[in-house]
């Protein structure tokens, strides 16, 4: 979940209050799972297709089935690699 912070100055007490606002966005994991499932349903090798997309940036590696292509384009490719690496290393 992506969060942003909003800082407000309350004039009456002159105190700084920090609010955390959650945006309703799917996590990288949720998006990858949805894309993986869509690719599998269409008979593609999901790992090869996702790797092809990450290396080339060409969204045609990802099927439009179940809106998978639009979903994966919401994430920067470097963010995908970062999340995959973090996940892989945390399991070792």
UniProtKB/Swiss-Prot annotation:
Coiled coil: none
Cross-referenced InterPro entries: IreB (IPR009309)
Domain of life: Bacteria
Family label: Belongs to the UPF0297 family.
Name of the protein: UPF0297 protein TTE1249
């Amino acid at each position: 979940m992506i969060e942003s912070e909003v800082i407000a100055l309350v004039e009456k007490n002159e105190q700084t209050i920090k609010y955390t606002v959650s945006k309703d966005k799917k996590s990288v994991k949720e998006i990858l799972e949805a894309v993986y499932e869509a690719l599998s349903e269409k008979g593609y090798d999901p790992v090869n297709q996702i790797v092809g997309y990450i290396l080339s940036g060409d969204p045609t590696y990802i099927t439009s089935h179940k809106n998978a292509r639009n979903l994966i384009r919401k994430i920067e490719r470097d963010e995908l690699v970062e999340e995959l690496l973090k996940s892989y290393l945390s399991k070792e």
